[in-house]
Amino acid sequence: MIHQLSGREGNVVAELPDTLKAFICKEISSVHELETLIFLRDHPERSWSPTEVAAHLFASLHIAEKDLESLKDRGFISCDGTDELPYYQYISRSEVDSSINDLATAYREFRVKVIGQIFFVENNRSAKRHN
């Protein structure tokens, strides 16, 4: 999964695998969206309201709602309830579960490297829009 180099300070990530970089580029639009996905994946047994997600992730309600809708639109989570009170739940999908698991592990162990990759992708998207 993650290529590691061993040093005096312990394991240091050399770089994220290309498959993980590609998954981030294709599927992850922000750090808070990744945290939302990981949070729901870590708690698949129940549905969550946007208010609950925002509280657990120390995010604004607006950001939580935006991330939840984006993840729903891409098929990572389902939505039950009403338009006024939606509830979201992680959907296990065999074709992406291993990528999400690898990304969650990388984010837990090599947070700065994953965040750097997300910002690299965001900056490239922004530059392409302005050209």
Predicted regions and their residues:
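Short alpha-helical segments that sit at the start of domains
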Residues: 7-35
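Short helix-capping/hinge SLiMs at alpha-helix to coil transitions
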Residues: 26-30, 41-46
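Short, cationic-aromatic polyanion-contact patches
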Residues: 27-32, 81-105
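Short amphipathic alpha-helical interaction segments
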Residues: 58-74
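Amphipathic alpha-helical dimerization/coiled-coil segments
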Residues: 98-131
